[in-house]
Amino acid sequence: MAKDGRPSNLPLLYNPLLNCIFNNPNHSRAPYKQIIHELASRHTDFTIIVPPSSLLHNSYDPESLKSSSKIALHDLAYHNEEFIRSHIVKTGSNSHAFLAPVAKVQSAIYNTICGKQILVKNGMIFTGKGFRRSLRAKITDIGYFDSFCDYFPSGSKFMLIYIDNSLYGSSDHPEPALEASPKAQQAKIKRPDQVPTESITFERLLRNFPLLSKSVSDPFYQLFHHNNYQFRVLRTNTHKKLSVIKSEFDNMLEEAYQIISNSVKSDSPDGEQTNNLLHQILRSYPELDLNKLVHEYVEINLYDKLWAQLIFQFSANAGLADPDATKIFTAEKYDELSCLSLNQLDIPVDEPWLLNDLLLRVYNAIIELSKLADATIIESSSKLKIISNTISILTENSNSSLMIDADTLIGLLIMVVVHSKIDFIEAHLYYIKNFMYGTISDDGYLSFIISSFDAVFFHLSHPDEPQYADMKESSQKNFEFWSLIRSHKVDEITALLEETDKLYGDKLPHNHFLKARNINGESALMLAIRSKNYDTFLLLLSRNPNWFSIEDILFDRNTTTSQNLLMVSLMEETKIITKILIEILGSCTLEEQIAYINSTDYSGRSVGHYLFHDYELINEVGHLVNWELKDHNSYTPLFNICRCYDHYAYYDLIKTAFSAVMSPNFNFKKHTDKYGNSILHILLKGIDQSGLLKADKNINVNCTNSKCLTPLTVYVKYGRIENLISLLQDKRLEFMFEDKKNFFNIFDYVAFSSRKQGDNDRGNSEEITSFIYSHYFKHFIPLKCTTVAFNAKFDTTKKDWIVYFHGNQNIILGLDSIKQSHHSFKLKNPHSLIPDVEKVWLNYPANGSVAPIFAKFRMNRLLENLNIFLVCLSMHPNFDTAPHETLGLSSSGNSSSLDQMKEVIGKQESSSKVTPHQLAEIETFLSLSKENLLGTLSTTIKFNKLMTVMNIKMGDLNTIREDSLYSAKMLCDMTPSIKTNYHTPDYGYRTMFQYFIWVELTLIEIIRNVNKVLGRITDWRQCHDRVLSLAGELRKYEDKRHELGTDEHSNSSWFGNIIENKRTRYKKLVLLHSEETKKLGLLSNEIKISHEDIAAEMSHYLMFRSKLIPFAIKQFTRVATTGLNRNGLHVLQ
């Protein structure tokens, strides 16, 4: 023993709690004795809560941190009975669990074996009554632990729930209390001074302070009432000067201020209290301007009337009462300038990349300014904020070195106003200048904003000015030229270009319509592509090559979508134009080509994302594409290509794309979308053409998406037969993979798919089902096992699991019926090496309840156990033809248990004699066989323990390696992956153990039968001795009978009584001798039949073992090699 009490002579398990329970040499001593006894007696009624191994090794009990000596959690796990009992939960049928009434919510309250309570709900465990603190721990995994110790039943499995913390908490993983105290809750409530000043309005003050509302509500109601004759001017639609409207508003504002003043006068009701209240508010918010709040309150209540008056005045151009109410931007003017381009406004920007920047600013500014037309914008401050934001968008310098001067700003603002097409924009500006709180002239920036808009209005208010005429003419020329492109009028375009060439030659003016771009930033070249006008596109490029420089072409893009010419050409599928653009791109440097191809649009997509429109282009530009670049949906170009399910040449598309992508540096994980789908998940067909499965590394064929679907389950779910066939042949495939969320396996998805398929898809579904079942029978089941269990569901009416069998016969049976058939078989064949029902179903007792999260997982293991049972039956010589009949899986009915017992008894009562010599031979044979079987059993038990421990230690090794990598990343200031606490996976040893345990169970069964017969032999000898003794006594009576024969008719009464007593004694001896002789005959018959049966079963055992062990090794090799292939270790030399 080590100093700390832990065993030093056994292979320690890395998790201290599991090591204490399953690998404890002191299990028969306190404090472990009672715990071990409870677990051993009803191991299926308990579930062990397992904290992370690293946490137990490296953390302390939080309660001990305040004391002078800290207590490590691993010491509690080894020595503290309460800690151990607190992590063992009663989940059996007698655990008194309170389940949630809603089935979708997996929640239940359970008691630990020390009387504490936990709540299991929605993947979390919450500590409750009895625990020192209210904590919560996340459930990270569940599983079964195969026991290998001698003090638990052989082959027993214990349910484990893995969590991310201990139920005592830990020093490295602090958890807050579930419910805050009332004081803490009160502290979270915002105090008045925490309310932002900007969010305070006068209306809010009225709601929050009833005293203030009581003082001013009635006067304000009268002020804003429609019958208020004093301000009737605002309610009559007559032509009037704008100053009159402004004056009426000012008067109402003064009335509002007076209402506030009157409310705080000492002679008014509650005046003093109202005054004190307002002073208290102002002290709490020193930055609050009460006059501003009142102004905004009046403005909100009068907005509808004010705005209606302004609209009426600005609409009456024929009978204007005020020159300031002139409507400049009419619908006609907007139409006249609708095609105006930025290059035609004397903006000193020639570089195409800077022009793109300005066009994008204009587009964003148009969106912002268009908010003025929103009917919910009813305050001058909101309107001012909109035009202020518009100016800020145009002048921002965050991503550009371009400086915007005043003249440039006016030009940009003209574009914004003209293309936003806001009706009555003049009224909006007038409202801002005349109805806002304060004076604009006091703020220099606001004055600059307003003056900028005034300048735009001035420039566009004089249609007779040459500047406006030029803009109108330019807009008209743009419209006519773009219309020619869209209508494919090549002859007219040719004549127009010839005329332009004669007029300007190589040097086009900056404001020429050939260089014009619409509000989306689309040039004539872009419009030609959009309209699929190849002739015009070629004509524009070839008429005079000096008109469009290489920079003009490379930076020609739709500024709203950021799509360049090549992207649009691919989208429009204009292959000839695409080819021309590729030729032009070939004249650039390699760096320029890569930058152009991988520049992204508004959705984050590059040219590579659109190559599926012309997949032959991949061979030319594939080497330039960044295939790992993700768009906003996390699609890489390769991922996007694979999703083109309706492509006319999908196979060629996939083959071409993967031939360009696949290389030794190909990273499979990079091509995953935000839902966790890999390329294998979304590939419709052509998996062989892709060559993905031929890659030696980086390909995880078992990866799951956010819905816990693997590529295999996706192919089954969506009927992708071609991919399914190819994937089933891959050595890395985990065919029986179960997701960690619902524990569905491939057979569940086959069942789901079969139920969802309609009549048209039924043939496809049946074909998929056939492939899945055939693969399972080929790789997981021996040839002679023709029927296995695939699915099950719980029947609430029968309170039993209904099992679905598939094979030569498709049968549905209840689990209880299967167990009864097994029991009947054992009654009929008491000496069969097939174990008893209790041994086979040791871990799955009848009516055994488990935690809700364990239900599906436990059912999967039960089906697994049932199939292994069927496999073992198929390897028994007596069941070569139909092993499934043993469990009642045949069409013929089984006889009852009573009939089976009568048949066995009748067989045993048949006459048969065994001589002592024969008996000695039988005894010698059985004794020698028992000795050999015990030696084999001892070796088998050791081997099974080794298999179990080996699988656990492999998991421990992997856990230690992950913990080491986590610590190393923390030391290197890297972002480590989240530490996990998962169930030990199967490294192949668990699979081998599941079959080798049957060798152990059959040996135990044969030895038990041998011991039973040896006991019968002892009974036979004792009975034989009694028969000989009784026969000797009978001979003595018969000899004395002749001596007493002469006195038989004596009249002496006393002498006659003696003779009568001897006769009675003689009769009793005869009867006793007859009974013992009959019993001896039965024993002889039973021993002979049992001997023959056991001898046959020993022969069957040798044949059974010779078949089972190679099959078990084959399954071990399959699981182990699958893991090696999955991890890429098969390439190591």
UniProtKB/Swiss-Prot annotation:
One of its GO terms (biological process) is early endosome to late endosome transport. Gene3D superfamilies: Ankyrin repeat-containing domain, VPS9 domain. One of its GO terms (molecular function) is SNARE binding. It comes from the Eukaryota. GO terms for cellular component: early endosome; late endosome; plasma membrane; transport vesicle; tubular endosome. Residues 324-469 form the VPS9 domain. Belongs to the UPF0507 family. This is UPF0507 protein PGUG_02975. It comes from Meyerozyma guilliermondii (strain ATCC 6260 / CBS 566 / DSM 6381 / JCM 1539 / NBRC 10279 / NRRL Y-324).
